[in-house]
Structure formats: C-alpha cells, structure tokens
C-alpha cells in the first residue's frame, strides 16, 4: 500500500478500532451532507462516524481482532465507532433510519460478536444501562420494604397481643 493517504487512513482506522467498545456499519448512499452532519450531531461526542474504504476497514478490523464484518463491507460504508453506551447509539441510528429511508444499518460488532442489522435494531429497543439499573434498584427497594414489614410484623403482633392481655386483666 504505497499511497500515503491510504496509509494515514489505515492508521486512523486502527486507532479507532483500538479505542472503541462497539461499532455499527451503515450505508450512507443517498444522504445529503446536511443529513450526515445532523446524524453526527445526534450521535454526540462518544461516537466517531467515519466514511471509509471497505478494504481499509477490513484490514484494520483484522489487525484489531474483529471478525465477521467481511460480508457487511460492500457498497458505500460508514462506520460508527462507539466509545460509550451502544444502546443509546443504536437508538439514534434506528430513529435516523426511520426518518431517512436512504440510510441503512448494515450490522455491527459488540462484545466480540458480529451483529446483523436486525440485531442492531433489537439492541435499539433495549433500555440503556442507567434505566436498567434504576429499574433494578426500584425492584430491590420494593422487595426490601416488603421484607422489613414482614420482619417487623411478628414484633408488632406480640406487642398488640400483650396490650390486649393487659387490658383484659385490668377489666
């Protein structure tokens, strides 16, 4: 690969693969520059959305140990390198795809597994980490309150029984 532009692009892709937690591959054909800019803005700072040559993405992925993307790397491809919450990014990409029919999610890679487009869309339907933890904490709090009431019940019942016996003796 004698082309210095390709070498620089490959080095950048390798760095992004090394720093990322998950990726989503998309097809951007038919999108305007304004739509792409809108998508980048919606994705936020934790996602690097880059258009790249498929051959360079394949090489960088192989060198990073990311497997299973070869079938997805056809046609014009843009890669969303996700450094944060993958669920939030999947939600943004799904909504953008619903609003812009030219935009297509091809698939992705998360936790050592290649993902199909349907799997990425299924991830978009999940609650994010914070919401899941809040639901878990709420469920635990409710059960702990019930348990505390259950443990306190025998003591209060004994106290009421003793008070009733005292009243009966006094009468």
Swiss-Prot record:
One of its GO terms (biological process) is translation. One of its GO terms (cellular component) is ribonucleoprotein complex. One of its GO terms (molecular function) is large ribosomal subunit rRNA binding. InterPro entries: Ribosomal_uL10, Ribosomal_uL10-like_sf, Ribosomal_uL10_bac, Ribosomal_uL10_bac_type. The keyword rRNA-binding applies. Keywords: Ribonucleoprotein, Ribosomal protein, RNA-binding, rRNA-binding. It holds the Pfam family Ribosomal_L10. The keyword Transit peptide does not apply. CDD domains: Ribosomal_L10. Belongs to the universal ribosomal protein uL10 family. Forms part of the ribosomal stalk, playing a central role in the interaction of the ribosome with GTP-bound translation factors. Part of the ribosomal stalk of the 50S ribosomal subunit. The N-terminus interacts with L11 and the large rRNA to form the base of the stalk. The C-terminus forms an elongated spine to which L12 dimers bind in a sequential fashion forming a multimeric L10(L12)X complex. This is Large ribosomal subunit protein uL10.
């Amino acid at each position: 690969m004698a082309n210095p532009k390709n070498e620089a692009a490959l080095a950048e892709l390798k760095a992004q693969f090394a720093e990322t937690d998950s990726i989503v591959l998309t097809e951007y054909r038919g999108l305007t520059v304004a739509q792409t800019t809108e998508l980048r803005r919606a994705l936020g700072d934790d996602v690097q959305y880059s258009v790249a040559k498929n051959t360079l993405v394949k090489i960088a992925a192989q060198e990073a140990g990311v497997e299973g993307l070869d079938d997805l790397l056809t046609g014009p491809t843009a890669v969303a390198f996700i450094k944060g919450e993958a669920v939030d990014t999947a939600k943004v990409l799904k909504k953008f795809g619903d609003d812009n029919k030219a935009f297509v999610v091809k698939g992705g890679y998360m936790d050592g597994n290649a993902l199909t487009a349907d799997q990425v869309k299924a991830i978009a339907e999940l609650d994010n980490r914070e919401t899941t933890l809040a639901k878990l904490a709420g469920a635990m709090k409710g059960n702990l309150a019930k348990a505390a009431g259950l443990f306190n019940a025998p003591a209060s019942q004994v106290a009421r029984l003793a008070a009733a016996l005292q009243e009966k003796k006094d009468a």
